[in-house]
Amino acid sequence: MGHIEYTKKMSATPEALWAVVGNPNTWGEWFSIHERWMEEPPAVLAPGNKLVAKVVMLGMANKFEWNVASVEAPTTLTLTAAGMAGVKVEFTFEIAAAGDGSELSVQGDFEGALIKGALGKAVEKDGLKQLEKSLDALDALAAA
């Protein structure tokens, strides 16, 4: 099992961040592992929603069936997903006010037969790199 977590001070307000995070149609602009939707996503995220996407990590494509586990707008979103080769993931995004901007914390867990040993460590390393890149792009988009 792999685990990543990252917290970043964001210049955008919590409401501006939520407007982007909570809108699946923006994910291609900031969520770096997201390549494209394979099915039209819902306009508004609600518990139980299913979102089918092509994602890329470590240069490898995978089809993820994201499920919205919980939503507490505008502060928390938890997504779970099942992918090919038994890959399972869970991501939680938590947004809090911090001064003039926000603090965004993301935690992610990965598991599956392939995510062990050296490959598990590579997934964690790439996942953290992608998460940092994603949050930079998210802040720029939300603050625009």
Cite the ranges covered by each PLM segment.
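Hydrophobic ligand-binding cavity/cleft-lining segments
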Residues: 1-46
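A generic structural signal for beta-strand entry/edge sites
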Residues: 3, 48, 74-76, 99-103
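Hydrophobic/aromatic beta-strand elements that line small-molecule binding cavities or substrate pockets
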Residues: 8, 64-70, 89-97
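Hydrophobic pocket/interface hotspot
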Residues: 17-21, 27, 51-53, 68, ...
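Glycine-rich portal/gate segments that line the openings of hydrophobic small-molecule binding cavities
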Residues: 38-83, 133-144
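Beta-strand/loop substructures that line and gate deep hydrophobic ligand-binding cavities in soluble
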Residues: 80-133
